[in-house]
């Protein structure tokens, strides 16, 4: 019983701590500057990161 409760807490905590990102569309990049225009078109905000040669767009405020 205790192990199930701990596992449930771990799952809930993990989902709460995941970053708020959008991006079903795969955008190839080499630098974060490559992500600004595609992210602006996708989310309306130029905030994005280039991670593993793929843009990860973040929402504004």
Curated annotation (Swiss-Prot):
Tissue specificity as recorded in UniProt: Expressed by the venom gland.
TM region(s), chain numbering: none
InterPro entries cross-referenced by the UniProt entry: Scorpion_toxin-like_sf, Scorpion_toxinS_K_inh
Residue list for modification Cysteine amide: 60
Bridged cysteine pairs (disulfide): 29-50, 35-55, 39-57, 45-60
Signal peptide (residue range): 1-23
Molecular-function annotations in GO: ion channel inhibitor activity; potassium channel regulator activity; toxin activity
Location relative to the cell: Secreted
SUPFAM superfamilies in the record: Scorpion toxin-like (SSF57095)
Main location, first listed in the record: secreted
Keyword Chaperone: no
Keywords tagged on the record: Amidation, Disulfide bond, Ion channel impairing toxin, Neurotoxin, Potassium channel impairing toxin, Secreted, Signal, Toxin
GO CC annotation, single: extracellular region
Manganese keyword on record: no
One Pfam family of this chain: Toxin_2
Domain notes: Has the structural arrangement of an alpha-helix connected to antiparallel beta-sheets by disulfide bonds (CS-alpha/beta).
Function: Blocker of voltage-gated potassium channels.
Family: Belongs to the short scorpion toxin superfamily. Potassium channel inhibitor family. Alpha-KTx 06 subfamily.
UniProt name for this protein: Potassium channel toxin alpha-KTx 6.7
Originating organism: Opistophthalmus carinatus (African yellow leg scorpion)
Lineage of the species this protein comes from: Eukaryota, Metazoa, Ecdysozoa, Arthropoda, Chelicerata
């Amino acid at each position: 019983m205790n192990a199930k409760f701990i596992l449930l807490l771990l799952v809930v905590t993990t989902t709460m701590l995941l970053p708020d990102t959008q991006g079903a569309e795969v955008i190839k990049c080499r630098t974060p500057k490559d992500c600004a225009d595609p992210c602006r078109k996708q989310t309306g905000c130029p905030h994005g990161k280039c991670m593993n040669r793929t843009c990860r767009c973040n929402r504004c405020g």
